[in-house]
């Protein structure tokens, strides 16, 4: 687990102008490129991280520590602690009432991906139940499978996506349930041939958001959402988006 302080706050921001309540929250994330990940020096970066830093500026909040940890740990803390913000969190129907939300960071296609040479054949979702499927523990990929009635005994979980990818390439699982964009980015970063991988089924299309512990006040979430909305409409966000999604 690594904790790093974000970029310095703007010099003109004073304590009187600051948003002390947003500064009392604990900001958690995972390795999930290109939305949030560690750079070469180990500091958090990515589209969602830079978006969050811009929100802090808009709300006159001093830059806060961001803690990177395995997703399952962050998700557990989100459910147990009163002052956690976890990102980038897919806002599914099952999760929606559990937390409070500021959206969107972006949108994701959650898919079942396997090896192109695999004999996997899926004509309907139920066909996938006979295969061994890998997923990141407590990630939306795992939760969507469970919500659709898949046998948890046939879902092999990993702490991080690179571990799940290794399970796929070594033949331990037939498919991975994950975010298509993040998976393709990981494949490229490991210098694997993307032609060797194939999407066999799309499970869902979901918003990525900042999820707040339920005890966080509605007013505070509203303040954060207002800052987020301003950033999303700004030229700064267009530059951030072009940096991490250059093809868009």
Give, region by region, the residue ranges found by the protein language model.
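N-terminal signal peptide c-region/cleavage motif recognized by signal peptidases
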Residues: 13-18
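Ligand-binding clefts/hinges and TM-proximal coupling segments of bilobed small-molecule sensing domains
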Residues: 62-65, 140-156, 195-196, 228-248
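Flexible hinge/capping segments at coil-to-helix
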Residues: 114-133
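Periplasmic-binding protein-like
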Residues: 29-31, 108-111, 189-225, 247-248
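Extracytoplasmic small-molecule ligand-binding "clamshell" domains
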Residues: 19-97
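A ligand-binding cleft/hinge motif common to bilobed small-molecule-binding domains
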Residues: 76, 88-98, 174-195, 200-204
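Extended ligand-binding regions for polar small-molecule ligands
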Residues: 46-59, 139, 210-240
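Short helices/loops that flank or line small-molecule/ion binding pockets
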Residues: 67-68, 72-84, 100, 127, ...
């Amino acid at each position: 687990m690594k904790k790093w302080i974000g970029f310095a706050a703007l010099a003109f921001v004073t304590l009187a102008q600051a948003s002390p309540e947003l500064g009392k929250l604990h900001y958690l994330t995972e390795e999930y490129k290109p939305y949030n990940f560690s750079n070469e020096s180990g500091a958090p970066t990515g589209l969602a991280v830079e978006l969050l830093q811009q929100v802090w500026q808009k709300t006159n909040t001093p830059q806060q520590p961001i803690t990177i940890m395995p997703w399952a740990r962050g998700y557990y803390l989100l459910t147990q602690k009163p002052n956690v913000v976890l990102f980038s969190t897919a806002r599914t129907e099952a999760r929606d009432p559990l937390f409070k939300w500021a959206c969107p960071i972006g949108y994701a296609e959650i898919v079942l991906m396997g090896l192109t040479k695999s004999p996997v054949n899926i004509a309907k979702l139920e066909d996938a139940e006979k295969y061994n499927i890998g997923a990141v523990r407590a990630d939306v990929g795992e939760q969507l499978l469970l919500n659709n009635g898949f046998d948890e005994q046939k879902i092999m979980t990993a702490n991080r996506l690179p571990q799940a990818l290794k399970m796929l390439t070594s033949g331990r699982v037939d498919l991975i349930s994950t975010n298509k964009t993040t998976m393709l980015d990981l494949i490229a970063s490991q210098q694997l041939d993307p032609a060797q991988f194939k999407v066999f089924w799309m499970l869902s299309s979901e918003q990525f958001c900042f999820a707040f512990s339920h005890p966080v006040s509605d007013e505070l979430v509203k303040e954060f959402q207002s800052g987020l909305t301003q950033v999303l409409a700004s030229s700064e966000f267009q530059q951030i988006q072009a940096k991490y999604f250059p093809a868009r």
